[in-house]
Amino acid sequence: MDASETSSVVNLPKQLRYEHFIRRVADTGQVWGLVRDGWAIGKTGDGALVFPLWPTDALAQQCAVLEWEGYVPQEFDLQELFDELLPQIEADGILPGITYTPDEYGLTPSHARLRADLQARLRQRASSGNEPVE
């Protein structure tokens, strides 16, 4: 993802950033978070805890500012998202936060919606003969 594409994604409304996340993660099999001594955790406007996720390292890196200064992008694969991260954050009462930007919270879908949307995109890719690019 080049700088102009990153800039374009940052300027999209939350829903379109979410749709971009679903497409990109299903296409690449990669998900990114920010880590320092532990994973970056945010909050919604009403105080709910959020685990922010990004579809690229460049988008994650842009958010390594303010309270997340010193955090670095860390990749994990789609299988880890399905098998480990989503079940763990759901059990902990933490929402997934999709493609935060330096200036705006990301969309916070339910765990079930995020899983269903990613699985639907993966099925769509499989039916067209495409596998995630590693």
Model-flagged regions — what are they?
Residues 1-134:
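Conserved NAD+-utilizing ADP-ribose enzyme module
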